[in-house]
A protein has these predicted regions:
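GST superfamily/GST-like fold recognition
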Residues: 174-178
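Beta-strand elements within well-structured catalytic alpha/beta cores of enzymes
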Residues: 6-10, 166-172
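Active-site signature of alpha/beta-hydrolase-fold catalytic machinery across serine-
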Residues: 67, 179-183
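Short glycine-rich phosphate-binding loop at a beta-alpha junction
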Residues: 50-57, 148, 167-171
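Phosphate-handling substructures
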Residues: 68-130
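Short, basic, low-complexity termini and linkers enriched in Ser/Thr/Gly/Pro
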Residues: 37, 142-150, 158-165
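Active-site-proximal alpha-helix that buttresses catalytic centers in soluble enzyme cores
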Residues: 5-7, 11-72
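Domain-level recognition of soluble alpha/beta enzyme cores
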Residues: 187-207
Length: 207
């Protein structure tokens, strides 16, 4: 069994909804903006190589993965559980449109952790995305894995080229990244927030 896996997780490129600060979640099938696609393509060579490619099923992640990893894309492994948070009745709306909505204000006042009407709570998101991440680890190990921890977490930005070959690249969402890393590496949920096209590199140590 391989004891250490190197993984990079990348947030998809920017969408129109991101620009308008909307809650773009699990239900949305937005594509990248033309400008975002051009930026990702321009920086393609600065993203590290990987042996396997995993993605969320969301179209914006598929778009991004195809631009960064064109040679791996046809063999990509789609993991449904790595999709973004289900924002329920908040989906597609922004703060300005909901600032006087009692249900939205209650959710925000609770630290954005509670159950969203028609959607998920943060705990539900964390549970789902951790299940998806475990699928990634087990696919890499080719067997059931009963324990692992995440170490050596470093932020990745595509402005600096890296030469490391990773065991896996995951193209997913801001919520997915914050959920998985805050649960496995510790720290505040929002401390793992990244801009579109950025992400984190880390090591998975298998026990």
């Amino acid at each position: 069994m391989k004891k250490r896996l190197r993984i990079i997780i990348i947030r998809h490129g920017q969408t129109k909804g991101n620009l308008e600060k909307r809650y773009i979640g699990k239900r949305s099938q937005e594509t990248l903006t033309t400008e975002a696609a051009e930026i990702i393509k321009k920086n393609e060579r600065n993203y590290p190589n990987a042996i396997l490619l995993f993605t969320s099923p969301a179209l914006r992640c598929q778009n991004t993965a195809k631009l960064i990893y064109p040679r791996l894309y046809h063999k990509r492994i789609v993991v449904d559980e790595l999709n973004e948070m289900d924002f329920g009745i908040f989906e597609g709306k922004n703060f300005e449109e909901m600032k006087n909505d009692a249900e939205y204000r209650s959710w925000v006042d609770g630290g954005c952790t509670g159950q969203i009407p028609g959607g998920e709570s943060r705990d539900a998101l964390i549970g789902r995305t951790l299940a998806g991440f475990s699928k990634v680890v087990e696919k890499l190990e080719k067997q059931k894995v009963y324990g692992y921890k995440v170490t050596e977490v470093e932020k990745f930005t595509p402005e600096i080229r890296g030469n490391e070959m990773f065991d896996a690249a995951i193209v997913a969402h801001g919520g997915t990244i914050m959920a998985v890393l805050s649960a496995l590496a510790g720290g505040d949920y929002f401390s793992y927030e990244v801009k579109p096209g950025e992400g984190y590199e880390f090591t998975v140590e298998i026990s």
